[in-house]
Amino acid sequence: MSAILSADDLNDFISPGVACIKPVETLPAAKPSADNELEISFNTDAPLPSDLPPAQISLTDCLACSGCVTSAEAVLVSLQSHAEVLSQLDSAPGLRLYKNATGTGIKVEGVEQGGKIYVASVSPQSRASIAATFGVTEREAGYMIEHLLSGPKGIKNRAVYRNAFQWVVDTNITREACLVLGAEEVIASMTDTGSKKPVLTSSCPGWVCYAEKTHPHVLPHLSRMKSPQALMGTLIKTTLSRKLGISPDRIWHVAVMPCFDKKLEASREELTDAVWEGTGTRGVRDVDSVITSKELLMLADSRGIEFSKLPRTPIPTSSRIPFPDTKIDSFLFPSNRKGSGNGNRDAGTSGGNLHYALHYFASQHKGSSIQTIKGRNVDVVDYTVVAENGEILLKAARYYGFRNIQNLVRRLKPAKPSRMPGGKPIGSARRPNGKASGPDYSYVEVMACPGGCTNGGGQIKVDDPINTSRLEGDAKAGPQEQKMWLAQVDEAYFSGEDNVESSSVDDRNDLVEGISPSYIKDTLSHWAATTGLDLERLVYTTYREVVSDVGKNVGDAERVIEIAGKIGGGW
């Protein structure tokens, strides 16, 4: 497990935003033995040290809530750390890529030596955390990360085989694809009588994990769209394996993310090549490992690199080997982008799924407007798209944090059937005739962390050693200091808004919030045609009810069997 977890950090990562929704497990008191003939008492209320169970840390302590992770998953997730990244880079000489003689293709060398191609994807929330820590813009933080992972002054400088990441990509690219397809999914669900409404976002793995193990009745509501992390993993593995003629296990993909839950997402068996390649494959993960923003700094420290001194300018494009498909290369590494960086501030810091869906829907209804209604706290907001004549066309909402998610899930819970013959379902008597059991939303953006993804558990915190200079003397970071720090990270997240080049993609005229749906769909169609795979198998995923073994007496044999049987476990 990553060294970022220590006995000094036993609190839930979303504290003090919300209280833990699961009670602490109370262990039964030991029964006194009948063989004891003597009783010894002490004049103190303090228990003996031997009476206290040793404090232990598992992935359960880091994820969204207690009891949402099985022990088998905890083992799988604990293997992902900055140490694993360095171990992979030093395991064998990497595959060498060259332009062929004509300059129209990529040549691969070193396949027989057991090496791999290394690719990294970086989230904008992680860049924002780095930017706030070192006092730079989000874009400059991205350049520093790129120099660390693939530049001459980065980790390759002290590596055994001088391996580095061949490509460092921005997950904002696949985020745009997720926004377009997600918006179309919502619109399609409004006319499909067989679909469950509302559609709930599924890009937050903490929320998905909680739903699968605690509230399986909401699973039919989850969006089928993969997250930007997962979609990027599939895009990289499928394209490189097809274009370079190598197996997916020769491509090693690491993602830099803001929360620990993304490690769990990468371990899902639904996100392996077994899904898009078909049966009979080994189940190679689309994302091999996930490290957090904080672990990225630990990666630099492990190589003796002072992160703050890394260049804040881009690596020359002339030194980059182009991606082996021209159209996908221009998609992943656009020379000019028309948009607003990480999106409008009204979209929030979690990708803007809801914001884009509202504007996409409004763009198809001329004269309509978007109205905002604030909820009982800052993490609950209702939205409506209203026609020119005042008719409500769509209702949507944003629910962040588990305290608010609890209320949403409760409203979606189906009524219990009556035990009396001919009786109405329990709870239906309080509903007006014809009113559905759940809310009348068409779409709800759900995130586990209060404030959104910039407040993820893997982000650099105000009281971390690198930020101790911000605190005066021995003062500890309280709720107010943490709130101010999160505001700085949010500001860094949007710091790239004014720096985006003003140029369009193919000069399309169908832009919605800076994104061209036709360009996205054309690129995705090209991807499917290039790989020879059905687009639905590439961009969509599934969910299932999972029974957690946390707090249950599960033997080691059962745990080993569960891990060994997991498709994405690497066994």
From Swiss-Prot:
Organism superkingdom: Eukaryota
UniProt binding sites for [4Fe-4S] cluster 2: 204, 259, 449, 453
The UniProt record lists the keyword Metal-binding: yes
One Gene Ontology cellular component annotation held by this UniProt entry: cytosolic [4Fe-4S] assembly targeting complex
Keywords: 4Fe-4S, Iron, Iron-sulfur, Metal-binding
Family: Belongs to the NARF family.
Name the record gives this protein: Cytosolic Fe-S cluster assembly factor NAR1
